From Swiss-Prot:
One of its GO terms (molecular function) is GTP binding. It is found in: Cell membrane. Belongs to the small GTPase superfamily. Rho family. GTP binds at residues 19-26, 66-70, 124-127. This is GTP-binding protein Rho1. The modification Cysteine methyl ester is found at C205. The lineage of its organism: Eukaryota, Fungi, Dikarya, Ascomycota, Saccharomycotina. Pfam families: Ras. GO terms for biological process: small GTPase-mediated signal transduction. The keyword Membrane applies. A motif (Effector region) lies at residues 41-49. Residues 188-208 are annotated as: Disordered. It comes from the Eukaryota. SUPFAM superfamilies: P-loop containing nucleoside triphosphate hydrolases.
C-alpha cells in the first residue's frame, strides 16, 4: 500500500508498467495505489494512478501508467512511454510463457521507446508458485512455475536494475516493488550496461 505524505511531493516521477495481458499488472497497481485487491478481472486499455511515496527521506509523487498487454493495443501502447522515469516489466510466475515474452517482446519494445530508462523485472502472483492446482496443471503440460533463478537470469540478460517478486493478492512484496521503482526513477537514465539481447538498436523515448 502506498505511503501517504502530508505535504505536496516536490519530486514527480513517471512509472510505466508493461507485460502480457492478465499477468497481474493492474492488480499490482490497484493494491499499491488503493489498498484493495480487485475481485473481477477487467482487461486494461489504459489507466493512470498517482501515489505519494517516501523513500530515503525524499517525497515523490509517482504517476503510475497502466497499459494493455494484448496485441490489439500494440500500436496504441507506445503513447504511454514518453517521459518515463522507470519501467516495470511484469510476468506471471504461474505462466512460463509470460517470462519468455519478456525476452521475445517486451524488452525490445521498452528499449526501442525508452533508451536508458531503468527497468525492473517483476514476478507477479508469487502466491501461485506452490499452489497445488497450478503446479498440477502446469505439470500436465510438461511445465512448472517459474523459479527465482530462471527469472533472475532473465533480469540479468535484459539489464534490469532489480528483480522483485510479489503477490497483489496477499500483499507480499508490493511495497518493495514501488519503493525500488521510486529509487530507480531518482537515479536517472543509465548508459553503462547494455542488455544481452539481439535488440541493440535503441531510440530515445518517442511516439509513433
Amino acid at each position: 500500500m502506498s505511503q501517504a505524505v502530508g505535504n505536496v511531493a516536490s519530486i514527480r516521477r513517471k512509472l510505466v508498467i508493461v507485460g502480457d495481458g492478465a499477468c497481474g499488472k493492474t492488480c499490482l497497481l490497484i493494491v499499491f495505489a488503493k489498498g484493495k485487491f480487485p475481485q473481477v478481472y477487467v482487461p486494461t486499455v489504459f489507466d493512470n494512478y498517482v501515489a505519494d511515496v517516501e523513500v530515503d527521506g525524499r517525497r515523490v509523487e509517482l504517476a503510475l501508467w497502466d497499459t494493455a498487454g494484448q496485441e490489439d493495443y500494440d500500436r496504441l501502447r507506445p503513447l504511454s512511454y514518453p517521459d518515463s522515469n522507470v519501467v516495470l516489466i511484469c510476468y506471471s510466475i504461474d505462466l512460463p510463457d509470460s517470462l519468455e515474452n519478456v525476452m521475445e517482446k517486451w524488452i525490445s519494445e521498452v528499449l526501442h521507446f525508452c533508451q536508458g530508462v531503468p527497468i525492473i523485472l517483476v514476478g507477479c502472483k508469487a502466491d501461485l508458485r506452490n499452489d497445488p492446482q497450478v503446479v498440477e496443471e502446469l505439470r500436465a503440460q510438461g511445465l512448472q512455475p517459474v523459479s527465482q533463478a530462471q527469472a533472475q537470469e532473465v533480469a540479468d540478460q535484459i539489464g534490469a536494475v532489480d528483480y522483485i517478486e510479489c503477490s497483489a493478492k496477499t500483499g507480499y512484496g508490493v511495497r518493495e516493488v514501488f519503493e525500488a521503482a521510486t529509487r530507480a526513477s531518482l537515479v536517472g537514465k543509465q548508459g553503462k550496461s547494455k542488455p544481452k539481447t539481439k535488440s541493440s538498436k535503441k531510440k530515445k523515448c518517442v511516439v509513433l
